[in-house]
Amino acid sequence: MSSSEEDDGYVPFSKRPEWSDVKPLAQDDGPHPICPILYSEVFKDKMNYFRAILKSKEKSLRVLDLLEEVIQENPSNYTIWYYRREVLKAIEQDETIEYDIQQEMNLLNDMGETDPKNYQIWNHRRFIVEKYIGSDNKEKEFLSGVLLEDAKNYHAWSHRQWLLKTYRDWNGELAMVDKLLSLDHRNNSVWNHRFFVISNLNPSPFPLSLIEREVEFAFNHIRHSPNNESPWSYLKGLFKGQKISTIYPSLLDILLEMKSKYIGCSHVNSIILDIYQEQNTKISLENSLNICKLLSETIDPIHKNYWNFKYNTISDQLKLIN
């Protein structure tokens, strides 16, 4: 062991009395390893004892302590986390062993702060919540704190949505979305979560009253930043399974007014194009073709191939009418 590791105060397991009955099991790389990994002596020591425990299948409190030390060395090691869950399940069945599961949550909270995008930590957290904690507002509070730090943490969003669908505690979700959008209205993760919430709280397809409310919500953000794609995508999603021209015909007039105001905005033109195509009349399809040309040649030439494809598709649609 290096002097620096000794100076850190690390005590090898071979010098810990409570581990004197365990013979460490070294990693076997074969007689002539081509490219052996240069693990630190501390890491090798911990893993050697973990291999021994894994072989003996011991499940006890001291194993939890060992696993915590190994996890600190390599938080992404799936096998360590898996065996930790097996130990926790075994301890639960043993009436002679007491273990406060809050200790597990404390470990996860601490590790989540230093490694917030580690999948294994979040996977283990879900296991603990589902098996031992259940519906607990503290979990939502914890997630709100994580998302305030990084509102694009996929694992945090995934865990929150699992929590909501499992325990059905939707209180305050839209308010939380509003708060995060006030901090960054371009965050597509937040828009996605809002859609997730309203989709779970309302029938599908959405009723007109909800659509009108959410369209106005999207417009409030669009007026602030018309080239922000997120609210436009959200707006289009509100009409999934329904025709805009049928359920909300007045929307076209609103969009045409916005089109004249937000010159060069591809998003408003794209939705107008879709509505015209839905109407499926000679005039509306001709208007669609004009928009396709405008988008491909002037407003959005980077997606020229797509708009040309749309142009050809609508041209074929127009031929069926003529």
Curated annotation (Swiss-Prot):
Location of the region described as Disordered in the Swiss-Prot/TrEMBL record: 1-27
Keyword hit for Transferase: yes
Keyword DNA damage assigned: no
Top EC class for this record: transferase
Catalytic activity reported: L-cysteinyl-[protein] + (2E,6E)-farnesyl diphosphate = S-(2E,6E)-farnesyl-L-cysteinyl-[protein] + diphosphate; geranylgeranyl diphosphate + L-cysteinyl-[protein] = S-geranylgeranyl-L-cysteinyl-[protein] + diphosphate
Start-end of each PFTA repeat: 62-95, 103-136, 138-171, 173-205, 213-246, 287-321
Pfam family, one: PPTA
Region forming the signal peptide: none
Alphabetized InterPro entries for the sequence: Prenyl_trans_a (IPR002088)
Co-factor(s): Mg(2+)
SUPFAM superfamilies: Protein prenylyltransferase
Entry GO terms, CC: CAAX-protein geranylgeranyltransferase complex; cytoplasm; protein farnesyltransferase complex
Protein family membership: Belongs to the protein prenyltransferase subunit alpha family.
Assembly mode: Heterodimer of fntA and fntB (farnesyltransferase). Heterodimer of an alpha and a beta subunit.
Name by which UniProt lists this protein: Protein farnesyltransferase/geranylgeranyltransferase type-1 subunit alpha
Source organism of this protein record: Dictyostelium discoideum
Lineage of the species this protein comes from: Eukaryota, Amoebozoa, Evosea, Eumycetozoa, Dictyostelia
